[in-house]
Amino acid sequence: MKNLDKYLTLLDGDVDGLLLTSRYSRHYGAEFDIAEGVAIVTKKGCRYFTDSRYIESAEKNLKGFEVLDVNREIGYIQRLNTAIADFGVTTLGYEEHYLTAEEYFHYAEKLNAKLVPFHKPIYAFRATKEDWELELMRKAQAITDRAFAEVITRIKPGMTELELQAELIYCMYKNGGTGLAFDPIVVSGPNTSLPHGVAGERVIQKGDFVTMDFGASYMGYCSDMTRTVAVGYATDEMKHVYDTVLKAQLTAIAATKAGVPGKDIDGTARKVIADAGYGEYFGHGYGHSLGLEIHENPSPNASNTEPLPAGVVCSAEPGIYLPGKFGVRIEDVTIITEDGCEDITGSPKNLIIL
């Protein structure tokens, strides 16, 4: 079933049309990414509106949509209201998760159809991935693995975090990335105790841990990985913390399969870290799912009591962060299957000392 056909199955109940305003939902339905635009989906027809910057690409690549331009004379509201009239739409399901209050009130006031919150049904199709989506995500992760293998040859004492971040971004594009899944995190020394620290002018030194959290995207689909490496040498404490994080990750991956609640997977990793005496230093969730967005749902974390289905792609990223000293995080991307999970990250997980 094509993605657009999946959206059409939602039109048998509370709504007779879908208003797609998020880039991700438009990408999913049209199976092609256009940065700006709005789409309407009905059983009588589907239209995609965008401006002159993207119209040629949209006309060439979008599947299943009539493509129309918006300009100074004819804007989105006029295009939408024409479609509403042409297709006899009375109720439009909209993506409340992606609209600001200002945008919602604008649509609610101007459109000639009732707006119904409909984010969850629209979003639900993206939770589990089709085989072709998994193939794109494998390609994205392979690109990220190649970038890691290259960038670690460039890490040297004396370079700054920002310089390393620039090298990392270059390596992702050089190795085939069509974009970045997110802005990379590159931190060193005591800054590695900041789970989402920001690269700065700090100079990398011998004896530092360096943590890199990064991911290339490929044709819109994300990858995500984190590796912590040591420069020159690692102390016994650094090695012990690293080994603890790795054990937590491997134990949780082994416990992951379809039907297991997200909180149980999170709890498996958390118990390993707590038993080693570092429980208070693992503050974030074990992982998140990903796809067209870097953070999706459902996720393997403590707040998710629902069983995870096969076909969900999720990160596995426990960490320990000792304030003012150092931190360690190891992250892979896994695909949940009926009898386990497939780790699609190919980079080594043993402690690398450069």
Predicted ranges, named:
Residues M1-L354:
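Active-site neighborhoods and metal-handling regions in enzymes and metal-associated proteins
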